[in-house]
Amino acid sequence: AYTALRVIRNRNSRLISFILVLTLLTTCAVAYSLRPTGDILHRMVDVMLIAVALVNFRVGRAIGNQALEDGGHSTLTFLPNPYTKNISALILGLYAAVAACGAAEPIQGWLALATAAAFAARLQEWHSLMLLRAPYVRAHYAVSLALVAGYTLLGVAQLGLPAFFSPARHLLAISAMLAMVLVIMSIAGMRHSGLNLRFYPDTRLALALILIGGISRCLGADLALEIYDYIESQNLSCHLYFDDTIY
């Protein structure tokens, strides 16, 4: 409410989208406190990724121009496509709204694939060696690719392969959301502190560990359930054996 009041007083229409995202996050948080379910957590991740889609535009412009400057192309200017930014945020918002309303799985699946395609379109603007030579650009690209892969898996899961649903959600929550928050905060922190834009070793290690954790959790989601079920079955067998032995 305070942020919305400041935006209204400053008459800055460019921040209205962030106010909407903050409102949605607050709504999801209140709903989860009243009814803690996995579906609400999934909507919170989707809304956070909408915020990522909006913030990425400014972050991408900063790292793109820095990459050109570091590569000796300071006369060039990098400007991300604002239309793909808006389209990706709108389609993801539509998917989150449709999923919250309990639409049929095929509808959600096609919208998830549309979301993946919209974010994949944003990757095209980075397909230049002048940009990809910079390590922070490669990190940004890798996390964005994880987001595309996550919604692709989610769409496939909701169109008929439900075994991919849990891996997709783990990939989105860890390798997309958490990793992108790390990238954005590290880049924004250096820029606002007046420091040179560098991809420090500790940040690289943190990002690598998050990506590895997300991918391993994605690949091992079903395996972990099988191991858990096996352990539970073995415990039950042991209890039955000892009960028969004692009595």
Indicate where each model-derived feature is located:
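Hydrophobic alpha-helical transmembrane segments of multi-pass integral membrane proteins
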Residues: 1-247
